[in-house]
């Protein structure tokens, strides 16, 4: 049995993340041998978010492990605390942004289905991201750059 202890795990920061989105992350599924589920363990410093407001083609569950996190969602904002578990359904109803508005770090675990290709929509910036198996055809585009289904086919 493969396992990870989140109390001693050390997520890493991506130095390319811009200010406001600097959260440490550890992808946990590969560590424990997950194949059909995905998971991320995050440590979000004060004043930072883990990613922009978005919704996905996968269902996600958020468990706050320590601290408090403010969740922006389609109905407004809510502050979650350690022990709170919420579900973000696939599609627009599951849109969310997770921001630490406190003065102490927040630790959280996000678990989701792992359907590929994965699609995320970013309503604030009107972007759509697609992630494919092997990541060879990943793309991030603005909605206005879309083309007709039969473009260049006939």
Where are these regions (language model features)?
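Conserved short histidine dyad/triad with adjacent acidic residue
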Residues: 25, 40-56, 93
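Glycine- and acidic-residue-biased ligand/ion/polar-headgroup-sensing regions
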Residues: 59, 63-70, 74-75
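Short acidic-glycine-tyrosine-enriched beta hairpin
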Residues: 74-91
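A short, N-terminal "cap"/entry segment at the start of jelly-roll beta-barrel domains
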Residues: 1-36, 121-154
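Ligand-binding loop in jelly-roll beta-barrel domains
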Residues: 90-117
């Amino acid at each position: 049995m493969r396992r990870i202890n989140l109390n001693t795990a050390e997520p890493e920061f991506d130095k390319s993340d811009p200010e406001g989105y600097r959260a440490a992350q550890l992808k946990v599924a590969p560590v424990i041998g997950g194949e059909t589920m995905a998971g991320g363990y995050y440590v979000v410093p004060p004043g930072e978010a883990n990613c922009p407001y978005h919704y996905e083609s996968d269902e996600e569950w958020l468990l706050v492990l320590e601290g408090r996190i403010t969740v922006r969602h389609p109905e407004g904002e809510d502050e979650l605390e350690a022990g709170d578990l919420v579900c973000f359904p696939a599609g627009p109803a599951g849109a969310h942004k997770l921001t630490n508005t406190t003065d102490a770090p927040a630790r959280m675990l996000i678990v989701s289905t792992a359907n590929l290709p994965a699609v995320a929509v970013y309503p604030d910036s009107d972007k759509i991201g697609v992630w494919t198996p092997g990541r060879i055809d990943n793309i991030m585009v603005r909605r206005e750059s879309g083309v007709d289904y039969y473009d260049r086919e006939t």
